[in-house]
């Protein structure tokens, strides 16, 4: 599996680290326009100082960059620069850079090594770990891709200081998810210190990032290709979230914002189906109540949505099987499972309506 390094600064000693992992000192370094401006000089200078041969690539900082057209352009630049299978690709950025970089690495010369250097909380704790890499199709998100594990995941929590608050909260959705699905003690820590993590205070931030990354790594190690349902538990709340993202045209909602809404729906569904008790439901909701959204985002893209249309949009999600939706539910805080039985539409719709009412009450406080 991947080696995960969490430290500040993470760019020190890369030559030795690459040597230990049998990686060449020939790297294609992929940025988006934002991460190039924020971190490009530091990363490139650190690599050059240690004798790396580099090819630099930059993509627009937007979800639309996860496309065949952008990938083809980058393939061309790599071919023109004589990049062969002895090279590796270092992806410096958030989920878009990591997904596109991993997709290109998985497919170029039938696969070259990829190193992920995530710079957003969402990427550090989720998308950069586990080897799922993909691009989008007009009919759905992340539908075309590979399993291609990174050799290294290089995480520097200090880079999060560059993020706007909206991106921090978007990433926190995945962090909180790990407490829900896999680690009750981690949930307790987040319950006690959510404000410190949200404001990037140490040691709580690094603890949250490292614990999240290691939980994801552990789950992926035990069920790499989602064969026994364990890895599917990472998708707690995501079936709802992907439906919300589709309704918002994959543009108006951050993934983590949709996940936060989806977590509330999934908590209610777990309770309605008789698995999660009322006290645990309330604890979960109290934690999620602390999330902050931009003005009107919840109203416009969740409360004003048609619940039946949301349910219909959920059927484009990758977690459907044999045209049936599969839901990850909680037995208790810290223990999730993949519910293999069909869930009546009426139960799903009732969970959505309960979640909407919950958000309405939060907005009034």
UniProtKB/Swiss-Prot annotation:
Single Gene Ontology BP annotation: amino acid biosynthetic process
SUPFAM superfamilies reported in the protein's UniProt record: Dehydroquinate synthase-like
The name on file for this protein is 3-dehydroquinate synthase
Major localisation: cytoplasm
Q: Which InterPro entries match?
A: Dehydroquinate_synthase, DHQ_synth_AroB, DHQ_synth_fam, DHQS/DOIS_N, DHQS_C
Pathway info: Metabolic intermediate biosynthesis; chorismate biosynthesis; chorismate from D-erythrose 4-phosphate and phosphoenolpyruvate: step 2/7
User: What GO terms fall under cellular component here?
Assistant: cytoplasm
Which residues does UniProt call coiled coil? none
GO MF annotation, one: 3-dehydroquinate synthase activity
**Annotated positions binding NAD(+):** 95-99, 119-120, 132, 141
* Stored Gene3D superfamilies: 3.40.50.1970, Dehydroquinate synthase-like - alpha domain
Decide whether keyword NAD is in the record: yes
This enzyme catalyses:
7-phospho-2-dehydro-3-deoxy-D-arabino-heptonate = 3-dehydroquinate + phosphate
Q: Does the keyword Ribosomal protein apply?
A: no
Gene designation per UniProt: aroB
Per UniProt, Zn(2+) binds at 174, 238, 255
* CDD domains noted in UniProt: DHQS
What EC numbers are recorded for this enzyme?
Answer: 4.2.3.4
Its function? Catalyzes the conversion of 3-deoxy-D-arabino-heptulosonate 7-phosphate (DAHP) to dehydroquinate (DHQ).
Provide the species name. Chlorobium chlorochromatii (strain CaD3)
């Amino acid at each position: 599996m991947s080696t995960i390094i969490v430290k500040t600064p993470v760019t020190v000693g890369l030559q030795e680290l690459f040597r230990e992992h049998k990686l060449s000192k020939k790297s294609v370094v992929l940025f988006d326009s934002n991460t190039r401006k924020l971190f490009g000089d530091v990363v490139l200078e650190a690599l050059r100082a240690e004798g790396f041969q580099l090819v630099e690539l930059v993509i627009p900082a937007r979800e639309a960059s996860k496309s065949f057209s952008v990938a083809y352009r980058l393939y061309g630049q790599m071919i023109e620069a004589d990049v062969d299978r002895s090279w590796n690709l270092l992806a410096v950025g958030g989920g878009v850079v990591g997904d596109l970089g991993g997709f290109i690495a998985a497919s170029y010369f039938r696969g070259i090594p990829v190193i992920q250097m995530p710079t957003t909380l969402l990427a550090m704790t989720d998308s950069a770990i586990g080897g799922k890499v993909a691009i989008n199709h007009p009919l759905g998100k992340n539908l075309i891709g590979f399993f291609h594990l990174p050799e290294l995941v290089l995480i520097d929590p200090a880079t999060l200081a560059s993020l706007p608050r909206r991106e921090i909260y978007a990433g926190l959705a995945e962090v909180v998810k790990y407490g829900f699905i896999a680690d009750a003690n981690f949930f307790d820590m987040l319950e006690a210190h959510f404000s410190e993590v949200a404001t990037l205070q140490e040691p709580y931030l690094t603890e949250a990032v490292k614990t999240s990354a290691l939980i994801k790594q552990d789950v992926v190690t035990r069920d790499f290709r989602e064969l026994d349902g364990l890895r599917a538990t990472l998708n707690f709340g995501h079936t709802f979230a992907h439906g919300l993202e589709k309704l918002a045209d994959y543009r108006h909602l951050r993934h983590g914002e949709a996940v936060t809404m989806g977590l509330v729906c999934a908590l209610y569904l777990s309770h309605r189906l008789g698995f999660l008790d009322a006290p645990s439901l309330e604890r979960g909701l109290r934690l999620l109540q602390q999330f902050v959204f931009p003005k009107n985002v919840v109203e416009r893209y969740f409360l004003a949505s048609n619940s039946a249309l949301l349910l219909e949009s959920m059927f484009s999600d990758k977690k459907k099987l044999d045209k049936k939706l599969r839901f990850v539910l909680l037995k208790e805080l810290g223990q999730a499972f993949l519910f293999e039985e069909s869930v009546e539409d009426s139960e799903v719709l009732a969970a959505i309506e309960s979640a909407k009412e919950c958000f309405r009450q939060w907005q009034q406080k």
